[in-house]
Amino acid sequence: MGINTRELFLNFTIVLITVILMWLLVRSYQY
């Protein structure tokens, strides 16, 4: 159970970082 929760949290963090990076790229591209 702990390992699955840890993997889920890891995946969520990776997705969050990717979304933030993409948002920053789009924002800097627009300006």
Curated annotation (Swiss-Prot):
Any one GO biological process: positive regulation of protein depolymerization
Q: How is this protein situated with respect to the membrane? A: Single-pass membrane protein
Annotated compartments: Sarcoplasmic reticulum membrane; Endoplasmic reticulum membrane
**Chief place where the protein resides:** membrane
Q: Does the keyword Transcription apply?
A: no
Extract the CDD domains matched here: Sarcolipin (cd20253)
Question: What are the entry keywords?
Answer: Endoplasmic reticulum, Membrane, Sarcoplasmic reticulum, Transmembrane, Transmembrane helix
Which residues are on the Cytoplasmic side of the membrane? 1-7
Any single GO CC term annotated in Swiss-Prot or TrEMBL for this entry: membrane
Reported function: Reversibly inhibits the activity of ATP2A1/SERCA1 and ATP2A2/SERCA2 in sarcoplasmic reticulum by decreasing the apparent affinity of the ATPase for Ca(2+). Also inhibits the activity of ATP2A3/SERCA3. Modulates calcium re-uptake during muscle relaxation and plays an important role in calcium homeostasis in muscle. Required for muscle-based, non-shivering thermogenesis.
Spell out the protein name for this chain: Sarcolipin
- Organism field: Homo sapiens
Q: Which gene encodes it?
A: SLN
